Amino acid sequence: MTTRDPRHLPFFVYGTLRPGQLNHDAFLRGRTETEEPGHLGGTVLYDGPGYPYAVEEPGATDPVSGELVTARPEAYDRLLLELDELEECVPGDPASLYVRVERDVVRLRDGAAVRAWVYLAGPTVTERLRADGRRIDGDWLTHRAPDGRRRTRPGPDRR
């Protein structure tokens, strides 16, 4: 029997990794134990070129909607590396597209605060978005392409 490593935080996903989206199937299908609706406070959502960016904003009133994804223990380490690659997250590099940070996410079924990994816009991207980005409400799934196609981001080896 595999036991859970207490350092293995769940992931909070709010864009193309959500259930029903292409990157969910490519990266998460069969590798998770649970996927539960959640909300992330203190952030706002910007529409990117086919995928969203969450940006921290103290006092933000509308939470970002997404799912808390708990990876299977045997899949965790590899999944963490793959998600960092997908999100172009390079620890310590301010030019990274996203940064992976620990945040409290509200699990909707019981209102519990759950510590999770969240990919937020990196510093350079955040600055650009705040200057001229298009802010959207907190649920990216309501902002699909006009022709109804899912907005997706190519994963590693699919660019």
What kind of feature is each model-predicted range?
Residues 2-159:
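Glycine-aromatic micro-motifs
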